[in-house]
C-alpha cells in the first residue's frame, strides 16, 4: 500500500489531534472533543483504525485522542489521530520506529479503512503541500507562503468511506483533477474551489459561502472531505462568521511530535 493513495494539494494546519497513551492490559480507545470553553465530551469509545495501529505495532495500550475541530469534516483528523497515536506508542514502548516507519503504518491503515488516501503523506511535515504521486514516498513540495491565519466554518461531515468506496463518485473526482499544479497560493485556492465544483462534492452550503467569498475577494476552498469552507486572510473571519462558528488556525511548520513525555 506504500504506493497507493491520492495526489493533490492541501494545507497542513496547526490544529490537529493530541493522543495520550498508557500501558494497559486490554486495548481501549476514547475519542474526545474539546470545546472553546475547555469542556470535553466523549465522541466515541471505539476507533477501528486506532485499534488496528496497536495490532500492527504489536502493543496493548489505552489511547485517548483529543481535538478542537469537528470530526469527519474534512480536516484530516483521521490521519492526525493515527500519526499522533503511533508517535506516542513508539515513545511509550520504545519501538525504535523512524518517522518514515510511523508514516508507513499510519498510511497503510488509513487506506485499509478508507478514512483517507493522502492525508498521512501530507501530514508527515508542514506547509502548503503539493503531492506529486501517491503514497508516502512520492515527491512532496512543502511551501510556506501563507503567513496569516486561516479560518473555517463547518456544516457537518461527509462520510469519507462512502465517497472513496463509490466508483462513480471517484470517477468524477478523477476527471475533475486539475491539469497542472497550483503555481502560487492564490492559484491553490482557485484550483481548490474549481475541484470542489467539478467533482460534484460541493454542497449547497459551500456554494453559498463561495459566492460571498468571491464577492469579497477572499481566497477560499472546500474542506475535503467535509461540508465546510476554509478561507485565508484578514477579511476571512468577518466573511465566514455569519455562517456559523469560525475556527482559526495557521499553517503548521512540522509534522507529528511529542508534546509531553511522562516516562
Regions found by a protein language model. Name each.
Residues 137-263:
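C-terminal nucleotide
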Residues 58-69, 104-111, 205-216:
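Short, hydrophobic/aliphatic alpha-helical segments
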Residues 99-144:
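Alpha/beta catalytic cores of group-transfer enzymes, especially the acyltransferase/condensing modules
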Residues 1-3, 10-13, 113-115, 121-123, ...:
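Solvent-exposed alpha-helices and their adjacent loops that cap or buttress functional pockets
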Residues 11, 17-22, 119-123, 128-130, ...:
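Short beta-strand scaffold segments in enzyme catalytic cores
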Residues 75-99:
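DPxDG-like acidic metal-binding loop motif
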Residues 1-71, 241, 250-263:
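ATP-binding N-lobe of GHMP and related small-molecule kinases
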